[in-house]
């Protein structure tokens, strides 16, 4: 029997989202079932002006409550889309309106913020994500084409194989590495057999068609629930101009972009190598399983080429500047540790010795300047996300920098990062690892304003 349509109220919304089951054809004879917005993966591009009041009407056509998180936006707790902050759910077969002012300008995104736990058909394991662009007068310069590329994997499953996708370099600093390794065996982790950029596996969709001499503005988003990816555009370089939607002080050309769940990278690419090329994952197994797209110059018909990069290192700090940081009002040390789950269990995570949920909260005073020091005492890399605020990177593994503003930062295995932030968004504020399994099993904390 058909359910009644939930009733809308008030004026027409600026944007409408419908959460519902859908089928996605990743490639011929490769069709997967997921949950998505408006039967599309990614969901519809939301484009708005900075400072614009926005109303988004969300209809939930599933049997479970849902939350839509406006990632990277400076919005009140009650609309941020996190249950832990007190945002109301979009009820099953009901609707909810999110109303906020669009800020700050830049590449943002929206996605499910529902806990999945052991159900790999919920939360960020699904196709519930989309790009959100907030335009301002400060544009990235002239470009001929704008492209949105979301990185995804599909059909997740639990495995005993270590899924930390950031290949450790033996020369990397490990300031947080313990003298004695933990002898306990790891628990089950999440892997996936299928990969795509947007909704197509490599070679299955239309190529990205370009012309020699064009400047292409690429918006890259890692919409994965579990994996860090390293992206290469064969024969070309990325001129990185923004991280997490925020312009960098020193744009730089790089051969590889390392991007963790939740992160965005904006880059200009000069089309100066006519041919047919592959833009895709550095790791052969991920690229051959679908993570890539063909880029085809006009009047070029040959087989797509893949060329590995000469340099494969990624370093946030090259995009920063040298400048002193104002002294913080308070320094908060945050120590992250893993409790291994064993071969048939799940790893659990501690923040300062506590697994979420717990009674301990970190406290901000409005207007205060805080220095957060992230100590990663685990053998996994973690993309750490602060809701409703931006922070500035101060140092990474002892390498200083300034001017790089983000909302999500990778802290490497046994590594350390320091960020500065101003407490200027009153209300409960969620902090967590953006790997869904880590978040679900303890890697979260709440900040509240005094």
Sequence positions of predicted segments:
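Short, hydrophobic/aromatic beta-strand segments
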Residues: 28-30, 64-71, 111, 227-234, ...
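Acidic-aromatic/histidine active-site loop/patch
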Residues: 145-214, 221-224, 339, 344-354
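Extended terminal and domain-junction accessory segments
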Residues: 2-16, 119, 124-168, 249-381, ...
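Short, conserved beta-strand segments of beta-strand-rich sandwich/propeller modules, principally
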Residues: 55, 97, 107-109, 217, ...
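Extracytoplasmic beta-sandwich strand-turn segments characteristic of Greek-key/jelly-roll folds
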Residues: 41-48, 70-104, 201-208, 238-273, ...
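Asparagine-centered strand-capping/turn motif at beta-strand->loop junctions
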Residues: 58-62, 220-224, 374-378
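N-terminal edge beta-strand
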Residues: 24-50, 192-213, 339-370
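Extracytoplasmic/lumenal soluble domains of exported proteins with redox or metal-associated functions
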Residues: 2-110, 114-119, 124-125, 130-131, ...
